[in-house]
C-alpha cells in the first residue's frame, strides 16, 4: 500500500513470488482503506496476508479489529530512520529474547503461537 508507489528495482519484485502493491489507483485514501484492501484481497482469492505498513495502515487494521497476530521487535538501539509504529495497548502473549532484542507476540481471536 503506497500513495507514491514503489521503485521497480526493489527486491520484492524479483519474481520469486506474486506481489500485490496497492496505490491511489486502487485505493481511495479518503475512505476506509481496510475495507478496500480486504475487498481487493477477497477478489484476488488471497486468504492470508502480512501487512508491513506504516503507522497509519497498521493502526487502521488494529482499530478495525481486522488482525490475528502482531509481532513487534523491540531494541535498545536508537533507530534514527524509519516510521514509528502504532502504540499497542495490549499485553504480549509471549516474549522471546533474540540477541539484544525482544520479539513480542500479540494475538487476537484465540490465535496461538505453538509453532514458535
Cite the ranges covered by each PLM segment.
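Enzymes that bind and transform nitrogen-containing heteroaromatic metabolites
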Residues: 1-116
